[in-house]
Design a protein with these regions (language model features):
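Charged, alpha-helix-forming regions
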Residues: 1-279
Length: 279
């Protein structure tokens, strides 16, 4: 499927062909820190609305596709990884990218069956049809930048109909953030093995805020629920957090729960775990 968009024509962009081989996965810090994606595998059509200080975010999806999910965002992690790898190697990059589906699927830890390919196309459809309005990186905090996660994408084939891969165009907002080295972090490849939406979202938040600080970081449950954009009730969300602490499945980090003196409010703590101590 090829989805159109009122963006500037494809021919005005240079083509960036995906690089072969393994590379470290990189993620955009803005996407790690704020609620841009649905955390549910079921279709979500309720908009995500988030405001904190000068930061405003509104994410909307269509009735047909719903809002792009945190699993769909793996494609953006692949794109960011490609762009950073090429930039560091002195290779010219572009918002217009071409790749073979199996290259993307392999990188994000998926299978390469027909069903996996169909799921990849469905993810691309959700990324293209999801609209975002945000004040992040807008200097006044009052102006909103509006875009879709993918401006457009299409399947390629030769004259005989033999598949040649896919092309996609990334939005300026995402592309500019990835090119800024200060706005990108390397993530653990084990992230792609995480199966839960809240689990995946929490890893990205922990990686963004905890980094490699020896003392770690902490957030109260109420703040985490608000920052996740989750539609889960606070009680259910808290249960999910407690289950994650009990499971200790977060790559590179150890989670804990403490209660605030006086209020008794639960606080999630996290700190880096030395590689030798990771199971």
């Amino acid at each position: 499927m090829s989805l159109s968009s009122p963006q500037r024509p494809t021919e005005q962009l240079d083509l960036f062909r995906a690089l072969p081989g393994d590379m470290a996965p990189r993620d955009s810090q803005d996407l790690m820190a704020y609620p841009f994606f649905s955390l549910a595998k079921s279709r979500r059509t309720k908009p995500i609305d988030f405001r904190s200080g000068n930061v405003a975010i509104r994410v909307e999806g269509t009735q047909e596709h719903g809002i792009a999910t945190i699993w769909d965002a793996d494609i953006l992690i692949w794109a960011a990884s490609q762009i950073v790898e090429a930039r560091d190697a002195g290779i010219t990059t572009s918002r217009l990218m071409r790749a073979r589906p199996y290259e993307i699927l392999r990188f994000i830890g998926r299978g390469v069956s027909l069903r996996d390919y169909q799921r990849l196309k469905a993810a691309l459809d959700r990324l293209q049809s999801t609209t975002v309005a945000t004040s992040i990186r807008e200097t006044t905090g009052r102006r909103l930048h509006r875009f879709s996660w993918i401006n457009e994408w299409k399947e390629l084939a030769d004259a005989r109909g033999t598949p040649l891969g896919i092309e996609l165009i990334l939005p300026d907002w995402f592309y500019a953030g990835v090119l800024d080295a200060a706005l990108v972090l390397t993530i653990d490849p084990a992230y792609f093995d995480l199966t839960g939406g809240i689990e995946r979202w929490l890893y990205r938040l922990v990686r963004k805020h905890g980094g490699h600080q020896p003392g770690g970081w902490q957030f109260d449950f109420k703040h985490l629920h608000r920052k996740s954009g989750s539609t889960a009730k606070p009680h259910d969300f808290a249960c999910d957090l407690r289950a994650l602490v009990a499971r200790q499945s977060m790559p590179g980090y150890r989670l804990g729960i403490v209660r605030m003196p006086g209020t008794g409010a639960e606080v999630l703590t996290f700190r880096p775990v030395p590689p030798t101590a990771q199971g």
